[in-house]
Amino acid sequence: MARTKSRKRSGNNQNKNASVVNNKAEIAAMIDARRLEQKKKGGVTNSKGKTNKVVDAKLEKEFKDVLQRFQVQENDTPKEITKDEKNNHVVIVEKNPVMNRKHTAEDELEDTPSDGIEEHLSARKRRKTEKPSLSQLKSQVPYPQIIEWYDCDARYPGLLASIKCTKNVIPVPSHWQSKKEYLSGRSLLGKRPFELPDIIKKTNIEQMRSTLPQSGLDGQDEKSLKEASRARVQPKMGALDLDYKKLHDVFFKIGANWKPDHLLCFGDVYYENRNLFEETNWKRMVDHKRPGRISQELRAIMNLPEGQLPPWCMKMKDIGLPTGYPDLKIAGLNWDITNLKGDVYGKIIPNHHSRSKKQGRNYFGALISFETPEFENSKEDTQANAENGRQDDKIDDEVEHKLDHFQEDISEVTSAEEKLERNEEESEKQLYTVLK
């Protein structure tokens, strides 16, 4: 049944489609017939064109004013301007400024080249045309070595170049142009574990933690997860008993002027894969090695016999001493030649004049003593009286008595401090106590 119904439906659809096609053909035939009739009528009117022309001319004169109002003004067509019209200045008032507003805004943005051809440039194309070359940008700057090739592509390259070359401006880190995340490389996998500074190692905190019960890998394995979480929330107090006097001395006496071995200078930015450990070792070696000494291995490599100065010392006669070592004394140049013994050919001898200047400086935050100016004033007074012949014996006796008394106090204080230090060295206190 279903198949018969579907067959009937398909037959009906085919009949409908055939009827639609027949109707379309009939409509097309009717349209063609109408067109032929209109063409025939047009031929008749053309034959009567001579009689109708007179009538049309009369009607045009009568309805000329009316038809002009309904004509569309063509503003897009360019008009030829004569020489007389160029000299005449005509002011045109727009009746419909809203219609022409879009065109005027576009005309203002467009650049009018010398050829007279209007070309519209986008902001990107304009930036490319106005982009300076690398040589031009470097010539405008006092430090051209700072300028890179990508600085020319900036929105304001001149401003960027002037900012980069100003004093105390830290450069942008180089990882801004890398697509991967900062410090996401594998170089951090081989990073050394953290080590305590030497000054904190003096408190023996590492030994103390290693002697605690359940310390190390075995202790961590024995601890359960619940015990570890409980120890974080509620730690046991008194497990580490430090000698707080030594801890105070580490930070306030021994470590008052302490600083790390290697500190990055101002503007030296850390970058990925930078090995600071090797840099610290190199700086430590440079600080340890001093000029004025040459090893036997270097003498053998240079084929330099003993008792002969290195070749760079001969150059120093013409050029002068290095600016980094102004107090350097070299045998045969500014030092006696008899001091050339073995591996030593020079020595850094600091100038006493510069040292006295450093000692005489007054630093900010120094304690002001009210006793020393009195003694200095009294000395100056006695010298002035001796020169002028008006020396007073009473003042000299008082000054000598005060100086003797002051020196005795200083000697007593120093002796007391030495005794305390000796007692501490003899009886060393235990830095910690292990509580089980």
Curated annotation (Swiss-Prot):
Phosphoserine modification sites?
A: S114
Q: Which spans does this entry mark as compositional bias, Basic and acidic residues? A: 389-408
GO CC, sorted alphabetically, is: catalytic step 2 spliceosome; nucleus; precatalytic spliceosome; Prp19 complex; spliceosomal complex; U2 snRNP; U2-type prespliceosome; U2-type spliceosomal complex
Keywords, sorted A to Z? mRNA processing, Nucleus, Phosphoprotein, RNA-binding
Task: Map out region (Disordered) in residue numbers.
Answer: 1-22, 374-436
On the tree of life, the source organism's domain of life is Eukaryota
Query: Major location, coarse class?
Result: nucleus
> Where does it localize?
Nucleus
Q: Which positions does the record annotate as the modified residue Phosphothreonine? A: T104, T112
Locate the compositionally biased regions of type Basic residues: 1-10
- GO molecular function, a single term: RNA binding
Stretches of Low complexity bias are at 12-22
Q: Name one Pfam family in it.
A: PSP
Which Gene Ontology terms describe the biological processes this protein takes part in? mRNA splicing, via spliceosome; spliceosomal complex assembly; U2-type prespliceosome assembly
Assembly and partners? Belongs to the CWC complex (or CEF1-associated complex), a spliceosome sub-complex reminiscent of a late-stage spliceosome composed of the U2, U5 and U6 snRNAs and at least BUD13, BUD31, BRR2, CDC40, CEF1, CLF1, CUS1, CWC2, CWC15, CWC21, CWC22, CWC23, CWC24, CWC25, CWC27, ECM2, HSH155, IST3, ISY1, LEA1, MSL1, NTC20, PRP8, PRP9, PRP11, PRP19, PRP21, PRP22, PRP45, PRP46, SLU7, SMB1, SMD1, SMD2, SMD3, SMX2, SMX3, SNT309, SNU114, SPP2, SYF1, SYF2, RSE1 and YJU2. Interacts with RDS3.
Additional comments on file? Present with 1830 molecules/cell in log phase SD medium.
Family assignment?
Answer: To mammalian SAP 145. Some, to C.elegans ZK632.11.
What this chain does, per the entry, is described as:
Essential splicing protein required for U2 snRNP binding to pre-mRNA during spliceosome assembly.
The protein, known as: Cold sensitive U2 snRNA suppressor 1
Provenance organism: Saccharomyces cerevisiae (strain ATCC 204508 / S288c)
Q: Gene for this protein? A: CUS1
